[in-house]
Amino acid sequence: MASRGTTETSKLKQNLEEQLDRLMQQLQDLEECREELDADEYEETKKETLEQLSEINDSLKKIMSGDMTLVDELSGMQLAIQAAISQAFKTPEVIRMFAKKQPRQLRTRLAEMDRDLMVGKLGRDLYTQQKVEILTALRKLGEKLTQDDETFLSANAGAALSQFEKVSSDLGSGDKVFALASFEVEKAKQ
């Protein structure tokens, strides 16, 4: 791959993004249809999806160990997988926008949520959870948060999001991040 150049790298990245999108959509659909499924069916489908995420994680690990030029581009996708597996983020839509590095779409979603809260279309608990996820994703993407957003995040960030943020900041190399994600995958399977 390295000898051929950017075309193959681009195609590989596109394929991995498409697989990640499919799995994130599958998680989102699963959450939306949770009421229609019995508990065993829900858990089995979720387990299968997490296993597929684990397989993508393993593929990314192999790619990153063999081709360091992919590290920067794939690290965002890997962090998104880590977040999904560790369940720091509960909203697949947020995970998808984070993986694709789409801060503008995240901010648009935040504005929509503010509106939905005002008109009573969105409950306070769900609003708080999703706003914390979006603000954390924006921060991880290097976006500047307002003082109000920082205060909201400090007051409402849960342990899982704090741990995700700490780990993703502390780990510099892709190998360490992958090692942690692999650990989280194994933990999620148990």
Curated annotation (Swiss-Prot):
Coiled coil: 6-64
Gene3D superfamilies per record: Beta-catenin-interacting ICAT
Official protein name in the record: Protein LZIC
Underlying gene: LZIC
InterPro entries: ICAT_dom (IPR009428), ICAT_sf (IPR036911)
Highest taxon of source: Eukaryota
Family label: Belongs to the CTNNBIP1 family.
Self-association and partners: Does not interact with CTNNB1.
Swiss-Prot/TrEMBL keywords: Coiled coil
Pfam hit, one: ICAT
GO molecular function, one term: beta-catenin binding
Nucleotidyltransferase among keywords: no
